Structure formats: C-alpha cells, structure tokens
Amino acid sequence: MSLTLRVTTPLAAVLEEEGLASIRAEDASGGFGLLPGHVDLLTVIEAGVLRFRRPEGPWHFCAIRGGVLRATGGRLVTVACREAVPGEDLARLEAGLKRQAEAADQAARRARGEQVRLHANAIRSLMRHLDRAPGADLSGIVEAFE
C-alpha cells in the first residue's frame, strides 16, 4: 500500500504524486509523519515545507503557505493551501521563495506608493472644487490634512 499526495491552491492543482512511502508536515502541535494506512486526519498546517518520498527514494519538497491537510482512507492525503511551490532541491526551493518574497514586497511598496498618490490627488481635487463653491469654509478641512 502507498500514499497519494495532492496539493491544490485556489488557482491550480500544483502537485499530484502517487506511490509515496511517507509524508511529513507540521501543524500547531509540531511535526508529524503520515504512512500508508494512517487513520483519517484533518489538521491546519503551518507555512513551511511539506516533505514526501517514495520507497527507497530521496525526499522531495513542496513549500506551502499554510493550509488544510486531510488524510483519508489510509491512502489519500490532500493539502489545500493559498500558495504552493514544489521543488526537488531544498536550497534551490528556498532561494526561489526568497526571490518571490522580495518581488511581492516590491510590488506591495509600489502599490502603497500609488495609493498615497491617488489619495493626495483626490484631496487636491476636492479642495479645488470646494474652493470654487461660494461661501465654502475650508479651514477645518485644511487643518485636518496638515
């Protein structure tokens, strides 16, 4: 008997491996392993690296950003998570994840900068329109944004 591992995200089925001898993951209680014939299990897993291997084979890896692991029937293990990145080499997987995190940080900084720019433009536009309104008192508005 062997295990089948399926890892899915909302956008794609990232991984499906059959004939596995063991799977290792981590939840709030710590690390745990699954072997063929394991009792049914449902747990929330932490962000980290899921490890799996075939009999007599090397470990393979899949970095996940938290999720839900479900083992059913002693054979099928499914992981539903927000993001997953499979990899054969742990060092290369870590380097790739670091690059992805840096790119996400840069994109978030650009988005924050754009949000500030749009907010400032909206305030300027509002001030121009209010300034044109007859009898408008802008003193409270101006003080609120200084």
From Swiss-Prot:
Topology of this chain in the membrane: Peripheral membrane protein
CDD domains named among the record's database cross-references: F1-ATPase_delta
GO molecular function: ATP binding; proton-transporting ATP synthase activity, rotational mechanism
InterPro entries: Alt_ATP_synth_F1_esu, ATP_synth_F1_dsu/esu, ATP_synth_F1_dsu/esu_N, ATPsynth_dsu/esu_N
Gene Ontology CC terms: plasma membrane; proton-transporting ATP synthase complex
A Pfam family matched in the record: ATP-synt_DE_N
Protein location: Cell inner membrane
HAMAP family linked: ATP_synth_epsil_bac
Known function: Produces ATP from ADP in the presence of a proton gradient across the membrane.
Homology family: Belongs to the ATPase epsilon chain family.
Protein name: ATP synthase epsilon chain 2
